[in-house]
Amino acid sequence: MKTFTLLAMLLLTACATNSEVEKRLLAMYEQDQSIRHQQLALTKAITTEGQTYLIDSLIQVIDIQQQIDQRNATFVDSLLQAGLPKELSDSAYHAIWIIIDHANLDMQEKHLSYIRQMAEERKIKFKEYATLYDRIEMKNNRPQRYGTQIIQFGTSNSPQLYLW
């Protein structure tokens, strides 16, 4: 079934117009960001406002987020393998970057060189490439090159930043 789904997606992307691919990528971006905003709001309510009764909702949102990330990553992976349509918008290229950034480590490593190429061609900002590069290094327990991955501890009045 997985093979059939992948083949169907490859055929779809091969036949898709720029407009269709663009719309799909932008919809994926919106869904990606929407679920993450829900997660952040629930996390804040639980951690800073003590609303622990929301933990089940947070777990459910994280599960949905993981499903969305996997579905988006599968589409972008097949799209990159089949070849991107030419002349996508900056927003579509940004969507590709964020989907790869939110994918698993294997996908991130697989497409890092493509993200670098997009940055060199100014289709995305270099800081987006740097973020992905550092995230991969962090996940592999190696030092960052650009210093983009930090965690804030403490209160908002006296935060302490920790560089991974």
What are these regions (language model features)?
Residues 1-8:
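Sec-dependent signal peptide recognition
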Residues 3, 50, 69, 155-164:
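Residue-level signal for functionally critical sites in structured catalytic/ligand-binding pockets
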Residues 13-14:
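C-terminal motif of bacterial Sec signal peptides marking the signal peptidase cleavage site
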Residues 17-90, 99-106, 118-121, 126-137:
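Preference for long, solvent-exposed alpha-helical segments and helix-linker "stalks"
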Residues 91-98, 107-164:
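Mature-region segments of soluble proteins
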